Amino acid sequence: MDFKQHITIVENFPKEGIRFKDITTLMQNGEVYKRAIDEMARFAKEKEVDLVVGPEARGFVVGCPIAYAIGKGFVPVRKAGKLPREVISVDYGLEYGKDRLTIHRDAIQKGQRVLIADDLLATGGTIEATVQMVEQLGGEVVGIAFMIELGYLNGRDKLVTYDVFSLTTYE
C-alpha cells in the first residue's frame, strides 16, 4: 500500500519553509490506519519483542496499537515532569535548544526485548535519547519502527546499529 497518499503535507508548518507530514489523515481512515499498524506489528513480531516503548506524543498513537496487536505491554516516554513515579531522564538537543525525556525507573527489566515506535524519524534526536534510556534500564532495543522517515535529514545515521523499519520514506 502507498501510505503517502494518505498523509497530508502541510506547507509552512510549524514554521516557514517546513513541509509538515500530517499522519492524522492516515489515522482517520480506519482501514489504512489498521494496515499501517498491522505492518509495523509484523515487524515487532519478527523481533520477538517483550515491550513496546513510544515517545510523547505521537509515539503513543503508533506504539499503543502495536503493543495491543502483538499482546505486549506499552511503556510511555514523556517530557520532564509528566510521570508520577521515580524516573530516569536524558537531555537531548533540538534545533532551538534542549529538552528532557523521562521514563519510569521500573518500566523495563534487564534483558527485555524492546521495540521503540514513533510516527516520524527526522534528525533522530528523540529516538536516540529514548534508546539511551531503554539501554540504561537494561533493555535490549531489537527494533525501531516509524510510520514516516525523512531520509533527507539523515536521522537513520544515528541509529546504524539498530534494525530500523519505516512504512514510508520521503527523500
Curated annotation (Swiss-Prot):
SUPFAM superfamilies assigned to the protein according to its UniProt record, in alphabetical order: PRTase-like
This protein's UniProt keywords: Cytoplasm, Glycosyltransferase, Purine salvage, Transferase
GO CC term, one of those recorded: cytoplasm
EC number: 2.4.2.7
A molecular function GO annotation: AMP binding
Subcellular location: Cytoplasm
Catalytic activity: AMP + diphosphate = 5-phospho-alpha-D-ribose 1-diphosphate + adenine
Enzyme class, broadest EC rank: transferase
UniProt entry tagged with the keyword Nucleotide-binding: no
Pathway annotation: Purine metabolism; AMP biosynthesis via salvage pathway; AMP from adenine: step 1/1
CDD domains according to UniProt: PRTases_typeI
A biological process term (GO) from this entry: purine ribonucleoside salvage
Highest taxon of source: Bacteria
InterPro entries linked to this entry: Ade_phspho_trans, PRibTrfase_dom, PRTase-like, UPRTase/APRTase
Subunit structure: Homodimer.
Family: Belongs to the purine/pyrimidine phosphoribosyltransferase family.
Function statement: Catalyzes a salvage reaction resulting in the formation of AMP, that is energically less costly than de novo synthesis.
Protein name: Adenine phosphoribosyltransferase
Species of the source: Halalkalibacterium halodurans (strain ATCC BAA-125 / DSM 18197 / FERM 7344 / JCM 9153 / C-125) (Bacillus halodurans)
